[in-house]
Curated annotation (Swiss-Prot):
This is ATP synthase subunit beta. One of its GO terms (cellular component) is plasma membrane. GO terms for molecular function: ATP binding; ATP hydrolysis activity; proton-transporting ATP synthase activity, rotational mechanism. Disulfide bonds: none annotated. PROSITE patterns: ATPASE_ALPHA_BETA. It is a peripheral membrane protein. ATP binds at G155, G156, A157, G158, V159, G160, K161, T162. Keywords: ATP synthesis, ATP-binding, Cell membrane, CF(1), Hydrogen ion transport, Ion transport, Membrane, Nucleotide-binding, Translocase, Transport. It comes from the Bacteria. It is found in: Cell membrane. Induction: Induced by a decrease in external pH from 7.5 to 5.7. Belongs to the ATPase alpha/beta chains family. Produces ATP from ADP in the presence of a proton gradient across the membrane. The catalytic sites are hosted primarily by the beta subunits.
Length: 468
């Protein structure tokens, strides 16, 4: 095990000098610095660059407070390695695989795997055309998710990405009954804490491994924590042949941390100040999140859109890797429609008649057509009023508004805030409900009866309460 000395510390970047004759560590190797003689507390560094003359530049995975020039640094001879397997279920980790849930730490002989690996080869990959039911109407009808597929939840600040991902965990993890991995990447510690206790109370935690690298942690930890979660998921897929759910909140923070690290390493920034290696880093992560012949990984990723600008390089780079996109829209939040999913901007390659069936496809296409026409008529309505529309257009607008409200529903995870119980709506119920609205069966019911309800039966019950 070769050793070197700290030459300089610049925030989370640490330069280490190895004497002549010492073997230089490889890129991505983990180095260890002990903060005191008892060797109880250590800081892990990851090699990022080799500068020449025995000098390597590393990124710290923890705060560098207390490090000084001249301290000894040991090369572990391998990348950061984290615990994998059944022992990880029900536990909470940091980027290094250390437990942070105040329960017993892992033993030294626990199975570990390196977080840096190659993506599966082309001949190992497998695709599926089976739909993953979420119980959320707008998703199941207009942008359905594939088992073993990749889903992106796009949205600006405060439009409901984390609440939506928590509802998906609640619905899918409980219905799915398989193994789930949650990676909290650069998000609020409070949200992670809330999620942990909710999962503990519901019992889902027993089949879930959670990995956190939150906002307050150094960029190195935020950049690598997604790989830690992915490594745990890959083990269940490849070794145990499981169908795994991987939730990542938030992929943008992975890019943001990479941007910070890139600047600290002295690389020239690219478009909008992002790292020049943005597409490569995103590709290396996303290509590992895939389904193979041994098992599948269905990933649901929240993706923050800076200033609601979808042309920003970070969300634009992530777009290319996804099967389904669920776009959240601020205008719908302002209308009080939750989840604020934009039915026209969201898309899925699963919305095809050979996958969802002819009826589902036809209903979804007609819903989109009606909403698109309503969108086009809104300018006329704003300037001239409803009176200038033909009778046919007035009927279309009335149905479009009912559809828009019926696409909303109450969430189980938001019950403590709204006071309304959440609802899980099967796909068949969703398709039937929208088909009947399109056929004009409920034109006599008030628009408000369609807001924040589950199935079409709930609409009828709500209308009866309102006196209709």
């Amino acid at each position: 095990m070769s050793s070197g000395k700290i030459a300089q510390v610049i925030g989370p970047v640490v330069d280490v000098l190895f004497a002549a004759g010492e073997k230089l560590p490889e890129i991505n190797n983990a180095l260890v610095v002990y903060k005191n003689d008892e060797r109880k507390t250590k800081i892990v560094l990851e090699v990022a660059l080799e500068l020449g003359d025995g000098m390597v530049r590393t990124i710290a995975m923890e705060s560098t407070d207390g490090l000084t020039r001249g301290m000894e640094v040991l090369d572990t001879g391998r990348p950061i390695s984290v615990p994998v397997g059944k022992e990880t279920l029900g536990r909470v980790f940091n980027v290094l695989g250390d437990t942070i849930d105040l329960e017993a730490p892992f033993t030294e002989d626990a199975e570990r795997q390196p977080i840096h690996k190659k993506a599966p080869t082309f001949d190992e990959l497998s695709t599926s055309s089976e739909i993953l039911e979420t119980g959320i109407k707008v998703i199941d009808l207009l942008a359905p998710y594939l088992k073993g597929g990749k889903v992106g939840l796009f949205g600006g600040a405060g439009v409901g990405k984390t609440v939506l991902i928590q509802e998906l965990i609640h619905n899918i993890a409980q219905e799915h009954g398989g193994i789930s991995v949650f990676a909290g990447v650069g998000e609020r510690t409070r949200e992670g804490n809330d999620l942990y206790w909710e999962m503990k109370e519901s019992g889902v935690i027993e089949k879930t491994a959670m990995v956190f690298g939150q906002m307050n942690e150094p960029p190195g930890a935020r950049m690598r924590v997604a790989l830690t979660g992915l490594t745990i998921a890959e083990y269940f897929r490849d070794v145990e042949g499981q169908d795994v759910l991987l939730f990542i909140d938030n992929i943008f923070r992975f890019t943001q941390a990479g941007s910070e690290v890139s600047a600290l390493l002295g690389r020239m920034p690219s478009a909008v100040g992002y790292q020049p290696t943005l597409a490569t880093e995103m590709g290396q992560l996303q290509e590992r999140i895939t389904s193979t012949k041994k098992g599948s990984v269905t990933s649901i990723q929240a993706i923050y859109v800076p200033a609601d600008d979808y042309t920003d390089p970070a969300p634009a780079t992530a777009f290319a890797h996804l099967d389904s996109t669920t776009n959240l829209e601020r205008k719908l939040v302002q209308l009080g429609i939750y989840p604020a999913v934009d039915p026209l901007a969201s898309s899925s390659r699963a919305l095809a008649p050979e996958i969802v069936g002819e009826e589902h496809y036809a209903v979804a296409a007609e819903v989109k057509r009606v909403l698109q026409r309503y969108h086009e008529l809104q300018d006329i309505i704003a300037i001239l009023g409803m009176d200038e529309l033909s009778d046919e257009e007035k009927t279309l607008v009335a149905r479009a508004r009912r559809i828009q409200f019926f696409l909303s529903q109450n969430f189980n995870v938001a019950e403590q805030f709204t006071g309304q119980p959440g609802s899980y709506v099967p796909v068949a119920e969703t398709v039937r409900g929208f088909k009947e609205i399109l056929d004009g069966k409920y034109d006599h019911l008030p628009e408000d009866a369609f807001r924040g309800v589950g199935s079409i039966e709930d609409v009828i019950a709500k209308a009866e309460k309102m006196g209709f």
